[in-house]
Amino acid sequence: MVSYFTPPPSAPTALLKAKTCYSLWFKIYNDFPKAHRYTLGGKIEDYFLGLLENIFISIYLPPETKIPRLVIAISKLDGIKFFLQIAWENKCISNEKYSSLSEHLQEIGRMLGGWKKGLEKKTPPPK
């Protein structure tokens, strides 16, 4: 039987890396102090899900509409970094876990920035 459906585009490395980072966060979230799990932990969780959602949606958008969605993803990433730092400063996350997550987040940031920059070079500015 011949399939007439086009396969979905392969997932960009940024999405795969974000999924891996979210898996790390998910394990940390379960051990998050109960007093802060649904406030600070919930905020970080929401930003992570927003990051994943915006990267995923960006895959399927036409090039001219990807850039605004990537800007949102980058701002979600910045929010994760900010609230994770607050969690670490308040001893909700160990140094090792914070360091590991931070390394992943920095790499995701470089990937998203490169993706955005590449699109800006290819996409003509709107008239």
Q: PLM features: what roles do these ranges have?
A:
Residues 1-127:
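Amphipathic alpha-helical assembly/interaction segments
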